[in-house]
Amino acid sequence: MKAMLNPSRADCIAILSAASRIVDHTTLLDLNYKNLGLSRNGMETAASFLIERACFTRHREVDGLTAVGALSLQGRMRLDQLANN
């Protein structure tokens, strides 16, 4: 994935919110832009941005498809910051 500089706040919140529902640290959430209600470019940009900032306990990128694990402490803090500001 190729990241742009400024992902949408709403796109970041959508991905972080979806990942916040993961309780098992071995589970990965396949990111699907249609299921998240995002544009493909918006989802890819936000996912790259969040992965680069270590917002997930783990992630996987295979054949252009991205999956993320539960939120890391950084991810929980970023979600709280984005949702409350």
Which residue stretches match the model-derived regions?
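Short amphipathic alpha-helical interface segments
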Residues: 4-36
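Short amphipathic alpha-helical interaction segments
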Residues: 6, 36-53
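Non-catalytic, well-ordered alpha-helical scaffold segments
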Residues: 9-13, 44, 73
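Charge-rich, solvent-exposed alpha-helical interaction surfaces
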Residues: 15-18, 46, 78
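A short beta-turn/loop motif at secondary-structure boundaries
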Residues: 35, 62-63
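A short, conserved structural fragment
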Residues: 51-62
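Minor-groove-contacting beta-hairpin "wing" of winged helix-turn-helix DNA-binding domains
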Residues: 63-71
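Short, amphipathic alpha-helical interaction segments positioned at domain boundaries
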Residues: 71-85
